[in-house]
Swiss-Prot record:
It comes from Arabidopsis thaliana. Its main location: nucleus. The record marks 315 as: Polarizes the scissile carbonyl of the substrate. Disruption phenotype: Curling and serrated leaves. Down curling phenotype on both the distal and lateral axis. Residues 453-463 have a biased composition (Acidic residues). Induction: By jasmonic acid and ethylene. It is found in: Nucleus, Nucleolus; Nucleus. The keyword Acetylation applies. Binds 1 zinc ion per subunit. Changing residue 294 to V: In axe1-3; suppression of transgene silencing. Inhibited by trichostatin A. Belongs to the histone deacetylase family. HD type 1 subfamily. This is Histone deacetylase 6.
Length: 471
């Protein structure tokens, strides 16, 4: 195949057929701001989009601006009271006497702060994932991408882990209108708890999560958590340790997913590509390269099953942009040049100005013995599944409605935290070389400072450089 400006063409797959790729992007997504010092920065999506454009990948994409999901769309999963709260809360309303009680009730305020435009941000994220599902349902695309989605921690009636609305659950519910079985795969460093919980009692959705397990947010995803009732054995959890590298990850991902595809035979697949599993992430503990991360997408693409690709975590924002740009290239079937094209954020990718970065020399605490034990345990679990469970087609698919807790309990019970509010960036900067103050991977949030030194960049939302370099 001929190469073009976007890179070297790749084989489309075992069938030799090119993939039609739909790409959802909301131009205002980078304007939303969680607040000073907060690790979650929607601006990373704009940076990824800039790379996608400058690599000319847009020429191979059908680009759509998502329709904003409305309250009724979001209410297909989330409780009416919670949706009403998200629609009405604002920084200006925080002085209302009832605000403090509702913030506690819905777990909003620290990990998940109230910021300007919060509900529109949620509507854009959810609208992109629902729109991606509609494209797949109508057979208008083979792969549908929404890097603004993948917010996997949100629950029916509460925010969690920087996530307010679970766009993934909403997208899967849309897919279930047309597809009998949907496979959800999560490669974020954090367990995909919100999605697993939503579908824990049904066999129409199988959830598979590869994540750091132990003293780490959200503290769920034990290998023995396998689902319940009709969904028993349709939740697969792959608990991992610090330092997971490309070779180790691939040695688990490929055989396990191959077995899942063989046994479950999904009619559609959703892949959450949280980039906090990359080497050097500020909140992550793994050591994956961009290519190692993208190998998961490459493997799933080869099956030629309708595929939704979503974003997720990722807090070293220049590496998030690199990763999601490269994975967009994998989706369309090209291998882009490692040398970055000049773009608005070019200086943020220094000093190497390359698409790929080397993993760190950190120790891989996942021993061969542990890996073999996990692989054998999960393959045995998969061997016991009924092949391709048949279901009566339902226009309203089953969603696990977790029992509402008494409001007093909701206000007082401790909530897990993904990030301590006392842990901040150096001078609230976006210098990706520096970890979060007060954050330690193995123990989660701490109060000790992890690094010292002056910052190279002091902008929470990096400003694009509109002036090209002089020749």
């Amino acid at each position: 195949m001929e190469a073009d400006e976007s890179g070297i063409s790749l084989p489309s797959g075992p069938d030799g057929r090119k993939r039609r790729v739909s790409y959802f992007y909301e131009p205002t997504i980078g304007d939303y701001y969680y607040g000073q010092g907060h690790p979650m920065k929607p601006h990373r999506i704009r940076m990824a989009h800039s790379l996608i454009i400058h690599y000319h990948l847009h020429r191979r994409l059908e680009i759509s601006r998502p329709s904003l999901a409305d309250a009724s769309d979001i209410g297909r999963f989330h409780s009416p009271e919670y949706v009403d709260f998200l629609a009405s809360v604002s920084p200006e309303s925080m002085g209302d006497p009832s605000a403090a009680r509702n913030l506690r009730r819905f777990n909003v305020g620290e990990d998940c702060p109230v910021f300007d435009g919060l509900f529109d941000f949620c509507r854009a994220s959810a609208g992109g994932s629902i729109g991606a599902a509609v494209k797949l349902n109508r057979q208008d695309a083979d792969i549908a991408i929404n890097w603004g989605g993948g917010l996997h921690h949100a629950k029916k009636s509460e925010a969690s882990g920087f996530c307010y609305v679970n766009d993934i659950v909403l997208g899967i519910l849309e897919l279930l209108k047309m597809f009998k079985r949907v496979l959800y795969i999560d490669i974020d460093v954090h367990h995909g708890d919100g999605v697993e919980e939503a579908f824990y009692t049904t066999d129409r959705v199988m959830t598979v999560s590869f994540h750091k397990f132990g003293d780490f947010f959200p503290g769920t995803g034990h290998i023995r958590d396998v689902g319940a009732e009709k969904g028993k054995y349709y939740a697969l959890n792959v608990p991992l340790n610090d330092g997971m590298d490309d070779e180790s990850f691939r040695s688990l991902f490929r055989p396990l997913i191959q077995k899942v595809m063989e046994v479950y035979q999904p009619e559609a697949v959703v892949l959450q590509c949280g980039a906090d599993s990359l080497s050097g992430d500020r909140l992550g503990c793994f050591n994956l390269s961009v290519k190692g991360h993208a190998d998961c997408l490459r493997f799933l693409r080869s099956y030629n099953v309708p595929l939704m690709v979503l974003g997720g975590g990722g807090y070293t924002i220049r590496n998030v942009a690199r990763c999601w740009c490269y994975e967009t290239a994998v989706a369309v079937g090209v291998e882009p040049d490692n040398k970055l094209p000049y773009n608005e954020y070019f200086e943020y990718f220094g000093p190497d100005y390359t698409l790929h970065v080397d993993p760190s020399p950190m120790e891989n605490l996942n021993t061969p013995k542990d890996m073999e034990r996990i692989r054998n345990t999960l393959l045995e679990q998969l061997s016991g599944l009924i092949h391709a469970p048949s279901v009566q087609f339902q226009h309203t698919p089953p969603v696990n409605r977790v029992l509402d807790e008494p409001e007093d309990d909701m206000e007082t019970r401790p909530k897990p935290r993904i990030w301590s509010g006392t842990a901040t960036y150096e001078s609230d900067s976006d210098d990706d070389d520096k970890p979060l103050h007060g954050y330690s991977c193995r123990g989660g949030a701490t109060t000790d400072r992890d690094s010292t030194g002056e910052d190279e960049m002091d902008d929470d939302n990096p400003e694009p450089d509109v002036n090209p370099p002089s020749s």
